[in-house]
Amino acid sequence: MSKLFWDAQVPWLRLNGSGVRQFLQGQTSADLKALQSGDLLQTCWLTATGRLRAVLELRFDAEGADVVVLAGEASAVHAGFDQVIFPADRVRLQPLGQLRRLQWLEPMAAAMWCIPDAALPEPWASGEAATATALEQWRLQSGFPPGPGELNGETNPLELGLVAQVSTEKGCYLGQETMAKLIGQAGVK
């Protein structure tokens, strides 16, 4: 049997400018300061009260960052970012697009992004795209990504097992006070 992988078209936002890293550092829950150019990192976009709005995957480069929406409403992320970008931020938000995301159905498997119509590179070409049933079984076992009913405006990242996507060390970000309180109490509602 071939190795199974998740093959998905995902919403993609592009941010350009010299202030992109600082902007995303203040808007998302993970610490982005040490993220190297080209590396992928998952993070959460929260409300001011720490409710989960979206799970994002980021990749920085010399000109800015690519943001993939793994769970949540991409149009809400785009509009939310657009509302809080000021000229002093040195950030330009591009229109929404699509990327193709590949990930083996294994614990801690790294993901790869490519253009939507690209031929599968090796070793993906030797694997097998997971069926909807296999993907849902993996999602339920791994707890990732959150399902549509789990992003209901009432849950926080800790309740959905996304503690690795939340930094307790980085300082201020949207929803940070609630996350610090919950992590400090070592509990969820």
Task: List where the protein language model places each region.
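Basic, glycine/lysine-rich polyanion-binding surfaces/domains
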Residues: 1-189
